[in-house]
């Protein structure tokens, strides 16, 4: 099983080191994946503990093997859950405060590489795209049952695709004849819908549409928002949140959420500032995101769009 979930962690040291790991601290890896970030963090703990989340059975099984020595030592707890249920899942473990949390967002390499998962527009597979394979909603349902208007909405909102209407119309026309069953079928329809000059620039013409469908199937942005909103009060004062994003929608959301808690509210002119109120809930550790080094980009091409944002908790939310 371990061989089936090989994932090269992006910004590995930067993400974990940014947490200022305390050997006796309580930490969360919200996106276990291949276990790289968890393994590096665990190597710095003595009496501390790590709670590692994933909703993918293959990722959990693989990482259980990779991190067996830490599990045997009682230093790590694996939690099968979407990270949007962070607070309740930790409460079930008796945890109400943590020293830090990291997120490595998006789809992991093994999920893309396993053709049968349906994430790739280059490999023939059923239209699936579920990160949690126990979930009900699949890409097949979105493509074949969602209305023309619903498709336009997600293609614009989650794919930032300027030819959303043309693609939605093409899908609608095809499914009146027969259902769209596979990834390659869908990718070919998208190619047909997008004008030839536009197909020659900006990478594979199906990339943005597949991204939009994947985000819709897994409610990725909603899950990120829910989870980070829970993480901020969970983190102790002095603790940190490290988040790696891979596309502009994720990054914009994380940037906005951090900024909201790192900005003082407007105080009317002439009103005295009460002691202790001049601190924001969060402090941005880096004004600009941390990017992969040239060396990392050379060995891991999937790191090219990665951005790391880090925030430190300064005070509890009022």
Swiss-Prot record:
The gene is rsmH. S-adenosyl-L-methionine binds at residues 35-37, 54, 83, 104, 111. Specifically methylates the N4 position of cytidine in position 1402 (C1402) of 16S rRNA. HAMAP family: 16SrRNA_methyltr_H. Its EC number is 2.1.1.199. GO terms for molecular function: rRNA (cytosine-N4-)-methyltransferase activity. It is an enzyme of class 2 (transferase). It catalyses: cytidine(1402) in 16S rRNA + S-adenosyl-L-methionine = N(4)-methylcytidine(1402) in 16S rRNA + S-adenosyl-L-homocysteine + H(+). Gene3D superfamilies: Putative methyltransferase TM0872, insert domain (1.10.150.170), Vaccinia Virus protein VP39 (3.40.50.150). One of its GO terms (cellular component) is cytoplasm. GO terms for biological process: rRNA base methylation. SUPFAM superfamilies: Putative methyltransferase TM0872, insert domain, S-adenosyl-L-methionine-dependent methyltransferases. Belongs to the methyltransferase superfamily. RsmH family. Keywords: Cytoplasm, Methyltransferase, rRNA processing, S-adenosyl-L-methionine, Transferase. The keyword rRNA processing applies. This is Ribosomal RNA small subunit methyltransferase H. Its main location: cytoplasm. It comes from Latilactobacillus sakei subsp. sakei (strain 23K) (Lactobacillus sakei subsp. sakei). It holds the Pfam family Methyltransf_5. It is found in: Cytoplasm. It comes from the Bacteria. Coiled coil: none annotated.
């Amino acid at each position: 099983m371990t061989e089936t979930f090989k994932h090269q962690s992006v910004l590995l040291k930067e993400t974990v080191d940014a947490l200022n790991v305390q050997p006796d601290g309580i930490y969360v890896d919200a996106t276990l994946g291949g276990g790289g970030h968890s393994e590096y963090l665990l190597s710095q703990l003595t009496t501390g503990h790590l709670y590692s989340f994933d909703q993918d059975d293959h990722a959990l099984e693989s990482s259980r093997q990779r991190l067996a020595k830490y599990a045997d030592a009682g230093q790590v707890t694996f939690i099968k859950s979407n990270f949007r249920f962070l607070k309740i899942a930790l409460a079930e473990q008796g945890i109400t405060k943590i020293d830090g949390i990291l997120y490595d967002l998006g789809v992991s390499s093994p999920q893309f590489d396993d053709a049968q998962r349906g994430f790739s527009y280059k490999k023939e597979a059923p239209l699936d795209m579920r990160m949690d394979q126990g979930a009900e909603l699949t890409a097949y349902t979105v493509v074949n049952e969602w209305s023309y208007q619903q498709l336009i909405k997600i293609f614009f909102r989650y794919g930032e695709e300027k030819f959303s209407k043309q693609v939605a119309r093409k899908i609608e026309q095809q499914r009146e004849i027969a259902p769209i069953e596979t990834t390659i079928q869908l990718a070919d329809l998208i190619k047909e819908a997008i004008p030839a000059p536009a197909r020659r620039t900006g990478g594979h013409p199906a990339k943005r549409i597949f991204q939009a469908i994947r985000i819709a199937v897994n409610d990725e942005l909603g899950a990120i928002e829910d989870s980070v909103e829970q993480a901020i009060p969970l983190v102790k004062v002095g603790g940190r949140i490290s988040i790696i994003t891979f596309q502009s929608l994720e990054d914009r959301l994380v940037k906005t959420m951090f900024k909201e808690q790192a900005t003082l509210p407007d105080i009317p002119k002439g009103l005295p500032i009460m002691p202790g109120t001049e601190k924001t809930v969060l402090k941005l550790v880096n004004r600009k995101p941390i990017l992969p080094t040239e060396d990392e980009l050379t060995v891991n091409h999937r790191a090219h769009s990665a951005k790391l944002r880090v925030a430190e908790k300064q005070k509890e939310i009022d």
